[in-house]
Amino acid sequence: MKNKILIIATLAGSLVLSSCEDFLTHDNTTSANQETFFDTDEALEAATAPLYNYVWNSFNDKAYYSMGDGRANNITARWSDYIYPYTNFTETALSPGLEDAWGSFYSVVAQSNYAINNIKDYSGPQVSEKAKVQAYAEARFMRGLAYWYIGSLWNKGIIYENTAEQVNNSVVPANRGVDVIEFAIRDLEYAAVNLSKTASDVGRVTCYSAYAILSRMYLSMAGLTTEGEYNGSNIATDFNRGSRNTYYLDMARKAATKVIEEGPYSLLD
């Protein structure tokens, strides 16, 4: 009798534990995660949305003016600690804006890489190929723009395409500025070919946005290279030579012409 009671109790306990385990095992339907987030075209659009705002803040806040218009002497602000050092050519490694801008650009790079790789690895079967290509193009637009700034302002930069892998590889030699800008051009060329002609929402980039930025990047390469398409060795050393690489000047003209003639833009009345 005791043995029967023991067997019944054991079976009852097993059933209770099994039912409890089933009750406690549920799929995550509320918190976003890599495995389940990228399940619709709208989710991909949401994944690239952050690339338009906060990641740029530390650059746009002050450094945009000091390192851009300030250094070009388009503005002056003698009593400004974050503009005057640049207009007066007295900035140092500790000058306001430098570290913030560097961090901001690499935040853009990191988040763009995350978007590209997560979409590639975790997109569900319901996601259309068109939505994936559009998302890749938006992320590469932002990454390319950040790398153009890095190459132009520091003349060196660390190029990488997988943020998760980079975390485990903290010592990486910097690439030459011209190589960084070449990488940026490749990103923008991809964006120009694959972005839509019209924005899906106000403020989103289009193919004409990419062609406009490309025109500016080609002008940079016209001064950094001597003749023909960049091949790793035709790097200019005399920046006062009085001429520019006509290959990239022509590329810049074509990209700008495409925006002017085909884009939905017009001069103000």
Question: Can you say where each PLM-predicted feature lies in the sequence?
Answer:
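Bacterial Sec-dependent N-terminal signal peptides
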Residues: 1-30
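Short, surface-exposed recognition loops and adjoining beta-strand edges that mediate ligand/DNA contacts
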Residues: 62-78, 163, 196-212, 225-269
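Conserved, well-structured interaction surfaces
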Residues: 41, 45-58, 79-154, 168-182, ...
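A structural signal for well-ordered alpha-helical segments within the folded catalytic domains
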Residues: 106, 110, 182, 208, ...
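Short coil/turn linking the two alpha-helices of tandem helical-hairpin repeats
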Residues: 151-153, 158, 199, 220-229
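Membrane-proximal, proline-rich intrinsically disordered regions
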Residues: 20-66, 71-72, 94-96, 246-249, ...
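Short, conserved phosphate-binding/catalytic loop or strand-edge motifs used
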Residues: 160-167
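TPR/Sel1-like alpha-solenoid repeat signature
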Residues: 140, 211-217
